[in-house]
Amino acid sequence: MKCIVLAAGYGTRMQGLLGDVPKALVPLGRQVLLDALMQRLALLDLPTYLVSNSRYYDQFQAWQAKARWPIDIIDDGSTEPANRLGAVGDLAFAIDRLDLNDDLLLLAAD
């Protein structure tokens, strides 16, 4: 089994509150929301992949460099809400890009 974490949304409804920060990287106490998810996922010891969009990809890479969670981050290529793939599209993208042929645990990053 492998895990895919979907984090390629643009948070348009939260934009005024978050600025240009993905919802998954919003502070939650001394960590960010995604850290809380990864702490729980670490107990399962599954290969884990996060699907980001192009706008937030670098922010997720910077988070990973500091947090050092074992997760592969892939960019779905979308650059704005108008060309986003959507949840099902991002899932299909990840399965195809990573050539996955296994059971999957699918999670939303937020």
Enumerate the predicted regions with their spans.
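Short alpha-helical oligomerization interface
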Residues: 19-24
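Conserved N-terminal catalytic core of the sugar/cofactor nucleotidyltransferase
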Residues: 2-5, 13, 27, 31-108
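Glycine/threonine-rich flexible loop motifs
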Residues: 15-17
